[in-house]
């Protein structure tokens, strides 16, 4: 979930805590998105969430 503290930083909802560091979540789903998957400020993809045209 968003806001998890991990080794002194806060992970986004698209990240998981691994060995004290926020890393991109490796969960993927089989959906097609016109504009690709939604990404956080670190470039990590949110699982099964489509991006909007403006991203």
UniProtKB/Swiss-Prot annotation:
GO terms for biological process: negative regulation of coagulation. It is found in: Secreted. Keywords: Disulfide bond, Heparin-binding, Protease inhibitor, Secreted, Serine protease inhibitor. It comes from the Eukaryota. Residues 24-50 form the Antistasin-like domain. Pfam families: Antistasin. The keyword Secreted applies. Disulfide bonds join 6-17, 11-22, 24-44, 29-48, 33-50. GO terms for cellular component: extracellular region. The keyword Secreted applies. Transmembrane segments: none annotated. The record marks 30-31 as: Reactive bond. GO terms for molecular function: heparin binding; serine-type endopeptidase inhibitor activity. SUPFAM superfamilies: Leech antihemostatic proteins. PROSITE patterns: ANTISTASIN. Belongs to the protease inhibitor I15 (antistasin) family. Acts as an inhibitor of tissue kallikrein, trypsin, chymotrypsin and neutrophil cathepsin G. This is Hirustasin. It comes from Hirudo medicinalis.
């Amino acid at each position: 979930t968003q806001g998890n503290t991990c080794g002194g930083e806060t992970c986004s909802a698209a990240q998981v805590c691994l060995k004290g560091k926020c890393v991109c979540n490796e969960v993927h789903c089989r959906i097609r998105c016109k504009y690709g998957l939604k990404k956080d400020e670190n470039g990590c993809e949110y699982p099964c969430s489509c991006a909007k045209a403006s991203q």
